Amino acid sequence: MVAVAILAAGRGTRMKSNLPKVLHRLGGYSLVERVLNSCQLLNPSRQLVIIGYEGEQVRDSLQQLDSLEFVEQKEQLGTGHAIQQLLPHLEGFQGDLLVLNGDVPLLRPQTLENLLNIHKTHRNAATLLTAHLPNPKGYGRVFCDNNNLVTQIVEDRDCNAAQKQNHRINGGIYCFNWQQLAAVLPKLSADNDQKEYYLTDVVKFLAPVMAVDVEDYLEITGINDRKQLAMANGILQNRVKDHWMAQGVTLIDPDSITIDDTVELQTDVIIEPQTHLRGKTSIGKGSRLGPGSLIENSHIGDNVTVLYSVITESQVASGCRVGPYSHLRGQAQIGESCRIGNFVEIKKSVIEQKSNVAHLSYLGDATLGEQVNVGAGTITANYDGVQKHRTIIGKGTKTGANSVFVAPVTLGEEVTVAAGSVVTHDVPDRALVIARQRQRIIEEWKKTIESKK
């Protein structure tokens, strides 16, 4: 049985932000969400989030997650003080406690699983995650015997010249036997320059304490400022892109492409430069995206082409061509084999298969049947100043260039709309609608004007 405690009480002053540090986003999740995700493979019996600065904001951001317990640290007096706040909450708990930092978001689930397994196998009082860094400056050094049992942890500022040659550092990730830890937590002292209670100080009261090296030291990258957040994003992006290229996805210029790790891609997808996939997005096999496109929280079917376009909260079925310079938003649903072309905006509309909206159009709150052809410059006037209204256009209808449909209005099937029409009333099946001023020519108009000068 294992409980997880996540340290999420700090403000993160170096972020220069009103937002708590752990709520800054990395890919599709906040930092603290990523930490929570990393430990789900362990199936923890309890998950406790220690909150402090803007604690209600942290709590509200995680309210969609089940089984979280929130523990308040009213004063931020160090990591040891944070864990002391768990004493009344874990009274009588008989298992192990895994301690994670809410600002260390790149841990792999397998790393934590390995840490816990070694901890249990050796029946350690404490097991900590360590790493060998090329440049360990600023990190506490961990000293071990030949059996990886910890003999000493020395903070960087307290290391002498010889100790600084040790590149094995403390990653700040711990697994404790809770009952043994609970017995020594009251012994912690704030007798140091920072006047804080350090969790590392419990090591001198516990035995055995073992160190376990992380396979990739980048996993323990912590976030303290915007530069480190950007570095972590680069590490995450490399992981994600390496994964998808190994699965049969082509990235034309990986450095210019971003893909959230919440995105799902099928084989033979091709992603062109300056394309960004975000949120809960899925892309079907053989689709070609970009260059210069943004797709967020959307589903794209098989063999779709998206060129210089923005698609958010929408669905595009197989065989469609979108762009250049199209904007789909607000639950737009595009059926199979449709063409959505240059400078077209579609909002909260359903367009059925084999329909074309090729140029310079706005369709909002509309439903188009199959094989509708929308002429250039077609607009649905869906807002009366108070509420939105729907436009319904039946199967096989053709709208002329520069048409306006003043909603609510319904056009039947196979209707022909003359160019320049402003349609305000329903139109029956197979009708021709001409809703424009009859052309009038006044000859010699120029001469009339000149005579008045």
UniProtKB/Swiss-Prot annotation:
Residues 1-226 are annotated as: Pyrophosphorylase. UDP-N-acetyl-alpha-D-glucosamine binds at residues 7-10, 21, 73, 78-79, 140, 155, 170, 224, 329, 347, 362, 373. Binds 1 Mg(2+) ion per subunit. Residues 227-247 are annotated as: Linker. Its cofactor is Mg(2+). Acetyl-CoA binds at residues 376, 382-383, 419, 436. It is found in: Cytoplasm. GO terms for molecular function: glucosamine-1-phosphate N-acetyltransferase activity; magnesium ion binding; structural constituent of carboxysome shell; UDP-N-acetylglucosamine diphosphorylase activity. Pathway: Nucleotide-sugar biosynthesis; UDP-N-acetyl-alpha-D-glucosamine biosynthesis; N-acetyl-alpha-D-glucosamine 1-phosphate from alpha-D-glucosamine 6-phosphate (route II): step 2/2; Nucleotide-sugar biosynthesis; UDP-N-acetyl-alpha-D-glucosamine biosynthesis; UDP-N-acetyl-alpha-D-glucosamine from N-acetyl-alpha-D-glucosamine 1-phosphate: step 1/1; Bacterial outer membrane biogenesis; LPS lipid A biosynthesis. Mg(2+) binds at residues 103, 224. GO terms for biological process: cell morphogenesis; cell wall organization; lipid A biosynthetic process; peptidoglycan biosynthetic process; regulation of cell shape; UDP-N-acetylglucosamine biosynthetic process. It catalyses: alpha-D-glucosamine 1-phosphate + acetyl-CoA = N-acetyl-alpha-D-glucosamine 1-phosphate + CoA + H(+); N-acetyl-alpha-D-glucosamine 1-phosphate + UTP + H(+) = UDP-N-acetyl-alpha-D-glucosamine + diphosphate. GO terms for cellular component: carboxysome; cytoplasm; membrane. Its EC number is 2.7.7.23, 2.3.1.157. PANTHER family: BIFUNCTIONAL PROTEIN GLMU, NUCLEOTIDYL TRANSFERASE. NCBIfam families: glmU, PRK14360.1. In the N-terminal section; belongs to the N-acetylglucosamine-1-phosphate uridyltransferase family. In the C-terminal section; belongs to the transferase hexapeptide repeat family. Catalyzes the last two sequential reactions in the de novo biosynthetic pathway for UDP-N-acetylglucosamine (UDP-GlcNAc). The C-terminal domain catalyzes the transfer of acetyl group from acetyl coenzyme A to glucosamine-1-phosphate (GlcN-1-P) to produce N-acetylglucosamine-1-phosphate (GlcNAc-1-P), which is converted into UDP-GlcNAc by the transfer of uridine 5-monophosphate (from uridine 5-triphosphate), a reaction catalyzed by the N-terminal domain. Homotrimer. This is Bifunctional protein GlmU. It comes from Rippkaea orientalis (strain PCC 8801 / RF-1) (Cyanothece sp. (strain PCC 8801)). The lineage of its organism: Bacteria, Bacillati, Cyanobacteriota, Cyanophyceae, Oscillatoriophycideae.
